[in-house]
Amino acid sequence: MSWQTYVDDHLMCDIEGHEGHRLTAAAIVGHDGSVWAQSATFPQFKPEEMNGIMTDFNEPGHLAPTGLHLGGTKYMVIQGEAGAVTRGKKGTGGITIKKTGQALVFGIYEEPVTPGQCNMVVGRLGDYLLEQGL
């Protein structure tokens, strides 16, 4: 299965029990910042933004003072799981990033999708990749 299939079928899918509700953008990005696969709507990010995100996983709290930036959009960092999950909020939407052994799984959402639904979608694929040694 291609990485694009994982994004299309497992991240950009309808939210379970909520037909028509889905993430607004998603991607799988290697720890080195290389894009493995992304939705057409995923923002073009700068290398320094990805470096900041990786630093936050290695040094939890790194992004809290400045915010999480992706594609020029600033998200307020909210509670995640140190070294495993980073979450951000902006207006009625937000972002969830799950770190696996080799990649970062990104999910970006807007209402009516909830933070919990985004966390579930991103976490499920992230956990699967971890189980596969990825």
From Swiss-Prot:
GO terms for molecular function: actin monomer binding. Disulfide bonds join 13-118. GO terms for cellular component: cell cortex; cytoskeleton. The keyword Disulfide bond applies. Its main location: cytoplasm. The modification Phosphothreonine is found at residue 114. SUPFAM superfamilies: Profilin (actin-binding protein). Keywords: Actin-binding, Allergen, Cytoplasm, Cytoskeleton, Disulfide bond, Phosphoprotein. It is found in: Cytoplasm, Cytoskeleton. Pfam families: Profilin. Phosphorylated by MAP kinases. A motif (Involved in PIP2 interaction) lies at residues 84-100. Occurs in many kinds of cells as a complex with monomeric actin in a 1:1 ratio. The variability of the residues taking part of IgE-binding epitopes might be responsible of the difference in cross-reactivity among olive pollen cultivars, and between distantly related pollen species, leading to a variable range of allergy reactions among atopic patients. Binds to actin and affects the structure of the cytoskeleton. At high concentrations, profilin prevents the polymerization of actin, whereas it enhances it at low concentrations. Belongs to the profilin family. This is Profilin-2. It comes from Olea europaea (Common olive). The lineage of its organism: Eukaryota, Viridiplantae, Streptophyta, Embryophyta, Tracheophyta.
